[in-house]
A protein has these predicted regions:
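Extracytosolic ligand-binding ectodomains
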Residues: 1-325
Length: 325
């Protein structure tokens, strides 16, 4: 289900948030509530209104027809792309509104909608982050880009972005991923890149690579973080790197703002914030104050903006840590 949460700031901004009626939604709301407390302490007053859309497109249409959103400045959501498109079709080019997609990986709603923003860094932007890091840190390495045919375009984009480096780039269309069929092909490879959002393919490749007696650095996309069935020790063994637009380490936060968030959340809810709570909190603080948590660039000439603040991370000592640049 989707829930539309409208918040109206008395003085300047107004905000709307669409979230799922689930554990994720409750965690998201906790982040909003914590942000409201923080904003109130700075003199910013916000009234919150919730609309339950039940993840029903007809309910979203009903809300749009009611004109309830006409007077707000910022609309955050929906989570689901089909409903996000309905909202962006109405307000996507309205300069009086800013539309924010908090979690969806789909960028379709950004096209020709200049007032839209995507927080989940698109895969092409993640490719740029990975290739820039490799070009800066590695030279004269053997790099293999492994892909399946449906995602060949993203693999070729990765190859193109690496073409200016001094590394040796190989492309490998993976038809078989059994360890015995590919073991010898990786003996001289130092870096392996998996530019894929296919859960089954990435999982199988990581399992196969973990069984090869060789030393790798593996780069993947942010979706790896969502695959909770992966072996953490294997991820550490393979030194798996990936961009994370939602990075927050509650175990070891050296960022003073993150520490404030963590301490305040624990005091209010007697728990550690989930990533959904952190996302919600950061959205409110970024767009209702002058704190710049995200960094944006244009998606296309006449389109919206995407978040490019997605630091590279890796698992180290059983914890997700930022990669030192």
């Amino acid at each position: 289900n989707d829930t539309l949460v409208s918040s109206f700031e008395n003085k300047e901004d107004a905000n709307n948030i669409i979230l799922g009626k689930s554990k994720m939604a409750l965690e998201f709301m906790q982040g909003i509530q914590l942000a409201l407390d923080s904003l109130e302490k700075t003199g910013v007053s916000i009234n919150l209104v919730v609309y339950d859309t039940r993840n029903d497109s007809s309910k979203v249409v009903e809300i749009l027809q009611s004109r309830l959103l006409d007077s707000v400045d910022i609309i955050i959501g929906p989570i689901y792309s089909k409903n996000m498109k309905l909202i962006s079709d109405r307000y996507g080019n309205d300069k009086k509104h800013t539309l924010i997609s908090p979690l969806s990986k789909s960028s379709e709603f950004l096209k020709n909608n200049s007032s839209t923003i995507q927080l989940n860094t698109p895969y092409k932007n993640q490719v740029k982050i990975i290739t820039e890091f490799i070009e800066e840190k590695y030279n004269d390495q053997n790099i293999t880009i492994c892909y399946e045919e449906p995602e060949k375009g993203l693999a070729l984009y990765m190859q193109k972005n690496l073409s200016k480096s001094q590394n040796k780039i190989s492309m490998m269309n993976m038809i078989y991923t059994h360890i015995d069929s590919i073991r010898t092909q990786f003996l001289d490879t130092q870096i392996i890149i998996l530019p894929s959002n296919n859960r089954a393919f990435v999982s199988k490749m990581l399992g196969t690579l973990g069984g090869i007696d060789s030393s790798f650095i593996v780069f993947g996309l942010s979706n790896i973080k969502n695959y909770d069935h992966l072996d953490l020790e294997n991820l550490m063994h393979l030194d798996v790197h990936f961009p994370d637009p939602y990075y927050f380490n509650s175990n070891n936060s050296n960022n003073s703002k993150d520490k404030v968030l963590l301490n305040n959340f624990e005091e209010k809810f007697m728990a550690i914030p989930s990533r959904f709570s952190v996302v919600a909190y950061n959205i409110m603080m970024n767009f209702c104050t002058k704190n710049q948590i995200y960094e944006f660039e244009k998606f296309r000439l006449n389109g919206g903006k995407v978040n490019i603040n997605a630091p590279l991370v890796k698992y180290q000592d059983y914890s997700l840590e930022k990669v030192l640049e």
